[in-house]
């Protein structure tokens, strides 16, 4: 059974560890993430971008697939199915489709419009038992067509959005989606501390977790970050393992072309990467 993300993130905040959000793109991805989290006894948030939802033929398909897999795989750890960087329309669709959590990315609106839309979605989500994440200060880079400039969030705006009753907050602190450039200045911990103090101890979210040094992740967790999003890193190891399989000619040996065999090394690479992140975030055994 899917759960919303509120309880697992409050426990993470109070226990000073991070819950991973691993984005999923298909059945293999979902199976790999669930396998890793069950083996490590870690709670998990399965992130689905609107682009990934469309790729998997729609939010209803995703919700049905994930719910069935959690059941048929005998998963015992808490699993939330979460819309990542949702539009206003996407959030409403996921509430109806059977997701257990949503993120409304209103960071590109004026603060007034962001407040108005967030307020409405908080009421809709909570009425159906979903948790809701909101964003202030856009996250840099590109996430499935959503382009962010990498702003530092204003603590006052963060406080305004938090007061609307959201369950966790994504605040830009210099983090970006994708691979970090060589001249990246790092996370702004002073900004994170100000945001944490201004938002009444709400669980904070760190987007763009790929490529952030381990010591920065640990410091972010100590300053109130309870959820860390990983996507690009899993994509990179999946691509690398699949490429190696083909370059070694294994797809031409026997029935090596069978997609179940062809995709197996990539799927295992995702399992291994997820386990590595679970150890880093300190959430092994917390499920």
Q: Model features per residue range: what roles?
A:
Residues 3-15, 27-52, 57-76, 85-202, ...:
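Alpha/beta enzyme core
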Residues 4-20, 253-260:
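Generic N-terminal amphipathic, Lys/Arg-enriched alpha-helix
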Residues 17-25, 50-54, 261, 265:
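A short N-terminal beta->alpha junction/helix N-cap motif
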Residues 19-23, 81-82, 103, 204-207, ...:
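Short catalytic-loop micro-motif centered on adjacent basic/acidic residues
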Residues 173, 208-210, 232:
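Active-site proximal loops enriched in glycine and acidic residues that flank catalytic Cys/His/Asp
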Residues 246-287:
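Extended, intrinsically disordered, low-complexity segments
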């Amino acid at each position: 059974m899917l759960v919303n993300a509120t309880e697992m993130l409050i426990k993470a905040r109070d226990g000073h560890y991070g819950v991973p959000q691993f984005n999923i793109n298909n059945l293999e991805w979902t199976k790999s993430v669930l396998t890793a989290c069950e083996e490590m006894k870690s709670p998990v948030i399965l992130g689905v971008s609107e682009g990934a939802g469309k790729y998997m033929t729609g939010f209803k398909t995703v919700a049905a697939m994930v719910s069935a897999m959690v059941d048929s795989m005998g998963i015992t750890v808490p699993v939330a199915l979460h819309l990542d960087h949702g539009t206003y329309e996407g959030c409403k669709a996921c509430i109806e489709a059977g997701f257990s959590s949503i993120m409304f990315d209103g960071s590109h609106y004026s603060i007034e419009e962001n407040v108005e839309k967030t307020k409405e979605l908080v009421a809709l989500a909570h009425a159906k038992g979903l948790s809701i994440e909101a964003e202030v200060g856009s996250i840099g880079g590109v996430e499935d067509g959503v382009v962010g400039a990498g702003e530092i969030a204003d603590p006052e705006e963060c406080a305004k959005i938090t007061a609307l009753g959201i369950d966790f907050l994504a605040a830009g602190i210099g983090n970006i989606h994708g691979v970090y450039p060589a001249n990246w200045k790092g996370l702004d911990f002073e900004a994170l501390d100000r945001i944490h103090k201004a938002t009444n101890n709400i669980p904070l979210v760190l987007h763009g977790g790929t490529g952030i040094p381990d010591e920065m992740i640990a410091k972010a967790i100590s300053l109130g970050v309870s959820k860390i999003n990983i996507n690009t890193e899993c994509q990179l190891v999946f691509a690398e393992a699949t490429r190696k399989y083909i370059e070694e000619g294994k797809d031409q040996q026997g029935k090596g072309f069978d997609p179940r065999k062809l995709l197996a090394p990539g799927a295992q690479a995702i399992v291994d990467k997820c386990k590595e992140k679970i150890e880093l975030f300190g959430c092994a055994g917390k499920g």
